[in-house]
Amino acid sequence: MKGKKLSLVSSLLLALSALLIVASVFFPYWKMVFFAPQYPEGLNIIVFPNKLEGEIDIVNGLNHYIGMENFSAENFPELNYLLYIMIGLAVITLLTAIIRKKAMLYGVIGLFGILGILGVYDLSRALKKFGTNLDPMAPIKIDPFVPPILGHNTVANFVTESMLGYGTYFLIAAFILLLIPLWKDRKR
């Protein structure tokens, strides 16, 4: 039975991972900044696990001209439950740290990976929806487009820059802390 237990150091790494997951919910996960000659300082859409922030009203006013749907919490139902999923993941990670079973660690890593893949898929789906479902009656006609999850994009006179937020970096660090015990305790 001893061979299936995680070491105390690994358990502490898992507890730290749980703490990083909790900390992540207080920071943005993703953001997009819109730059144009009339907005050289940029307009932000900032995505937290439970809300949108930034100059959303201004962005929506501008997007109206190209027929893009409004950015709002109502259009992102994930914001109603993502916070709870992240807290649940932190609790499961902490329980794994306390119980110290390798099998539980494998489950947490798998769950974390699945949630990460679903998160990237969901964001890419939303960006595609917003960029390709343009109102044909809009005052300004542009070709449909898909804003990138990361990087730059140009539409008309707007340059957008998409980037990860600090919350995502905390999640990446938390995931790395989950992987270290796999290597550290590989012979246990």
Where in the sequence are the language-model features?
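Juxtamembrane loop-transmembrane helix junctions in multi-pass integral membrane proteins
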Residues: 1-8, 74-77, 99-103, 155-165
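Membrane-interface capping segments at transmembrane-helix boundaries
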Residues: 5, 183-188
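N-terminal signal-anchor transmembrane alpha helix
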Residues: 8-35
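Hydrophobic alpha-helical transmembrane segments
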Residues: 16-20, 77-99, 168-179
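Low-complexity, Gly/Pro
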Residues: 25, 83-86, 105, 120
